[in-house]
Amino acid sequence: MTKSLFDVLKELDSLVDFSRAKLQWDILIILATKGPSSTTEISQTINTSRKSIIDAIRKLVDKELVTKVKHDIYGLSDKGKELWNKIDSVLNIEVINGNNHKGQSKDEDILALENLSQYFYLINLSKMITINHDGLSLDKAARELGVSRQTLKYYLELFEEKKLFRVIGKRTHFKKNIYKCVLMNEGKRLLFRLPEFTKMKNNLPLKLLLRLTNSYTLEMANVKVMGFILISLPLLMYFRDQLGLIELPWLYAVIFLALLSVFAQILSR
């Protein structure tokens, strides 16, 4: 017989006290919806000190609801996933996971990618790898995506295990590791069927804009272009009588970058 709502809530409360463990619930929700995350990323997401996050995660590990995945990255354990399924039965929250795709074909299983967070990282990492043939700086990529370096490295290694990417080289540049990556055949076969990736591949203004602004994402490139324009226009107006031959090329550069940004945005839709 199906459990009543009261019985389910009572069982959940016995595992994680609703009244005293709000932070633990916040962490469980983040791990269930975003996938494995670092303590720094969790701390930034819920605006709580990292020390408090570490203490709360330690309690969740003791309760066997959370497990350490790698380095500073934590994810839901089997018991934690079971708990989340019970929450789902009460609140009807749909979280995609690997257990939901047993009857699907290999392509459908890869497309599902266990949860939406993997889809997010797959698309963004693939874009960066495709455009930046010189290599990928995890520190820079993590900063532009707003995630921790450990989290990004975890997903890069995960996709390498799934044979979607392959790291073919690694070098150090100004004390930062640059990863030379390529898409594997399985990754190409999957990604080239996605409209979002196809648009990016044919978006020449986007590729040029990212190169000129030394950016990995369109959002960061637009921020840099906007900053350049906001600084340039007042300077051009104030020093217009002193710039001489520099003024016209500078003005053309402002207009060119602005138009490039607009066309890159339009072709990305």
UniProtKB/Swiss-Prot annotation:
Induction: Induced during starvation conditions. Regulated by ArnS.
Protein name: HTH-type transcriptional activator ArnR
Knockout mutant characteristics: Deletion results in diminished flaB expression and strongly impaired swimming motility.
Listed InterPro entries: HTH-type_ArnR, HTH_MarR-typ, WH-like_DNA-bd_sf, WH_DNA-bd_sf
Membrane topology per record: Multi-pass membrane protein
DNA-binding span(s): 39-62
Transmembrane segments: 219-239, 243-263
Gene3D superfamilies for the chain: Winged helix-like DNA-binding domain superfamily/Winged helix DNA-binding domain
Cellular localisation: Cell membrane
GO CC entries: plasma membrane
